[in-house]
């Protein structure tokens, strides 16, 4: 190295390791409308100051690395770096903090949830300075939202396609989830749809197994849909699961569904991946298919309360990537979901504008700038006695999905569907008449059961079934 080169290097670059907080902790920073904002729950290792931990998150999820590098001088770090601009302790928790991080929009590829998550929830989650890290919420700026198509159709377009208004939609997951032949599977679909349900559903792990190949299932389910439509005069659907081992195979299944003339297909968006999901959502919009989304694997990511990612973030990501329905818990069934927290991300799925509300776990005001909404699906351990609570909690713009609560009826599948439809119609009518579903729910169901033997039988079977456990979420 020449003396001249040595002089320039010594002036422009100083090698070594320095604290992240010297560069990435900027409490005076004023956030921009175009920034992506993140709220992380940070648990530092013993001896690591919270400022250093928050700055480390900002650095490792944006432009930083473990040591100073000379190529930092070839760009403007001030323009591209993430910034930890706020810290607050978590009430009731020892050594946990909410770290607020702002990311410049130029860090992210347009229209790519995959790229956004690769940065924000990538390698930083394995960082040694942190005992645990959880992404609680994201604020997606309107400038970035406008680069996404979002849901293929949205709530209003779906209602218009189905010609169904003023009530939640009713669904049922076909059980047993694995093992039925395609013909017997189609028979169960037909019986449920004929009995009064709007939709039936493939279970999330039904793809194309030796006992039932996908093409056979699609054909028998299409026959069931058209037969039940002819008999009831209502538009029906079955969520045909197009999830597959490759994107090419997934698209082939979606194309076949469109050729059959069915109204809706399905995708497991977390196991299938956001790239595949966005591709399928684009195809569904272009070809008039509704898209039902299942969240299989979500609890691996969101169940631990100090590490991972809250489902509200996955819900926002799904609205960007695309889906007309997504499973969102029940509050009252067998799967975990605290009421206020669940309603917080349900509103984030459906509404155009949601105000910051920490009591519901919403850390940032979110403006969706007319991106279509997503119907939340309540599913998991629910039955007719839950109908008043579900109708009150989720309102009209939702799908209430009863699997065992339909197919477990003592008289069979069609009577199980009748019982659910009668219970729903009774609850909607009572609500419209001004009755209090929370207080009078059981009475409303009993009154309706006097005129419906199917509902009376269902009420008797499930009168003692409850799923009561302590909620785990903390704000």
From Swiss-Prot:
Task: Show the active-site residues.
Answer: 175 (proton acceptor), 294 (proton acceptor)
Provide any one GO MF term from the record: monooxygenase activity
Annotated PROSITE patterns: RUBISCO_LARGE
Primary location: plastid
Q: Does the keyword Metal-binding apply?
A: yes
Q: Name one GO biological process term.
A: reductive pentose-phosphate cycle
List the cofactors.
Mg(2+)
Span of the secretion signal?
none
Any additional notes?
A: The basic functional RuBisCO is composed of a large chain homodimer in a 'head-to-tail' conformation. In form I RuBisCO this homodimer is arranged in a barrel-like tetramer with the small subunits forming a tetrameric 'cap' on each end of the 'barrel'.
Question: What protein does this entry describe?
Answer: Ribulose bisphosphate carboxylase large chain
Its taxonomic path starts at:
Eukaryota, Viridiplantae, Streptophyta, Embryophyta, Tracheophyta
């Amino acid at each position: 190295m020449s003396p001249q080169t040595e002089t320039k290097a010594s002036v422009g670059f100083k090698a070594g390791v320095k604290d992240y907080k010297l560069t990435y902790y900027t409490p005076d920073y004023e956030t921009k409308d175009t920034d992506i904002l993140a709220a992380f729950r940070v648990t530092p290792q013993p001896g690591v100051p919270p400022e250093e931990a928050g700055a480390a998150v900002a650095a490792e999820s944006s432009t930083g690395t473990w040591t100073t590098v000379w190529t930092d001088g070839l760009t403007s770090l001030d323009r591209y770096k993430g910034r930890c601009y706020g810290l607050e302790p978590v009430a009731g928790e020892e050594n946990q903090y909410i770290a607020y991080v702002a990311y410049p929009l130029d860090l992210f590829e347009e229209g790519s949830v995959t790229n956004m998550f690769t940065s924000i929830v990538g390698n930083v989650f394995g960082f040694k300075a942190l005992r645990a890290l959880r992404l609680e919420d994201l604020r997606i700026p309107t400038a970035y939202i406008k680069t996404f198509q979002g849901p293929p159709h949205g709530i209003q377009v779906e209602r218009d396609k189905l010609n169904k208004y003023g009530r939640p939609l009713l669904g049922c997951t076909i059980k047993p989830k694995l093992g039925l032949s395609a013909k017997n599977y189609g028979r169960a679909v037909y019986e449920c749809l004929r009995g009064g349900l709007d939709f039936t559903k493939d279970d999330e792990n039904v793809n194309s197994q030796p006992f039932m190949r996908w093409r056979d299932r699609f054909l028998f389910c299409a026959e069931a849909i058209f037969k039940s439509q002819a008999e009831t005069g209502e538009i029906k659907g079955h969520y045909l699961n197009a999830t597959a081992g490759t994107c090419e195979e997934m698209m082939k299944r979606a194309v076949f569904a469109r050729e059959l003339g069915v109204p809706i297909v399905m995708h497991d968006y977390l196991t299938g991946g956001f790239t595949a999901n966005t591709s399928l959502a684009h195809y569904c919009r272009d070809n008039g298919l509704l898209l039902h989304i299942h969240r299989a694997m979500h609890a691996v990511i969101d169940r631990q309360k100090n590490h991972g990612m809250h489902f509200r973030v996955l819900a926002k990501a799904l609205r960007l990537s695309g889906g007309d329905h997504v499973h969102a818990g029940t509050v009252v069934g067998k799967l975990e979901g605290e009421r206020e927290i669940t309603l917080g991300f349900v509103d984030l799925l459906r509404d155009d504008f949601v105000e910051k509300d920490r009591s519901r776990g919403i850390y940032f005001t979110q403006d969706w700038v007319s991106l279509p909404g997503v119907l939340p699906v309540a599913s998991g351990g629910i039955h007719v006695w839950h109908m008043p609570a579900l109708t009150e909690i989720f309102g009209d713009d939702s799908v209430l999905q009863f699997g065992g609560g339909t197919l477990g009826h003592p008289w069979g599948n069609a009577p199980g569907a009748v019982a659910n439809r009668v219970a729903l119609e009774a609850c909607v009518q009572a609500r419209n008449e001004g009755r209090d579903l929370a207080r009078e729910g059981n009475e409303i169901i009993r009154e309706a059961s006097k005129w419906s033997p199917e509902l009376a039988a269902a009420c008797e079977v499930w009168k003692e079934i409850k799923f009561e456990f302590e909620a785990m979420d903390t704000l």
